[in-house]
A protein has these predicted regions:
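Short beta-strand scaffold segments in enzyme catalytic cores
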Residues: 25-31
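Short, basic/aromatic recognition patches
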Residues: 1-20
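Zn2+-dependent cytidine deaminase-like catalytic core
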Residues: 38-127
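Conserved hydrophobic/aromatic pocket- or pore-lining residues that grip, position, or stack substrates
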Residues: 10, 26, 58
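Short, glycine-anchored, charge-dense loop/turn motifs used at functional sites
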Residues: 33-37
Length: 127
């Protein structure tokens, strides 16, 4: 599977989301055959829904397409390191792998900081 191709796709979708009034995040779920089965773009402000993060949207769509609540043998690609809420959804959906393009430090640098959710010391990988 070409991970760089799918990560680039999430970046393109994130840019599209910005152009359509959404947040700068996107995610896709790919099945074991390399077929995209779920696409999500951040639509928190568009839907007035704080749970409408890209990863959650992509997971919802992929689960509907598979008619399953688990994403065994699937890969989740996302434009940015998932926040704690999305990590919870990822945990329960059980994809085989997760890849992200930007880190949470990158996100914080442009105004999307979730450090208040995880107020630990900076040296324990929870920024």
């Amino acid at each position: 599977m070409n991970h760089n191709y799918f990560l680039q796709k999430t970046i393109e979708l994130a840019n599209e989301s910005i152009n359509n009034g959404g947040g700068p995040f996107a995610a896709i779920v790919v099945d074991q055959n390399g077929k995209i089965i779920g696409i999500g773009q951040n639509s928190v402000t568009k839907k007035s829904d704080p749970t409408a993060h890209a990863e959650v949207e992509a997971i919802r769509q992929a689960c509907q397409n598979l008619n399953s609540f688990q994403l065994d043998n699937c890969i989740l690609y996302t434009s940015c390191e998932p926040c704690p809420m999305c990590l919870g959804a990822i945990y329960w959906a059980r994809p085989a792998e997760v890849y992200y393009a930007a880190t949470k430090i990158d996100a914080a640098a442009v105004g999307f900081d979730d450090a208040f959710i995880c107020p630990h010391s900076p040296d324990d990988n929870c920024h």
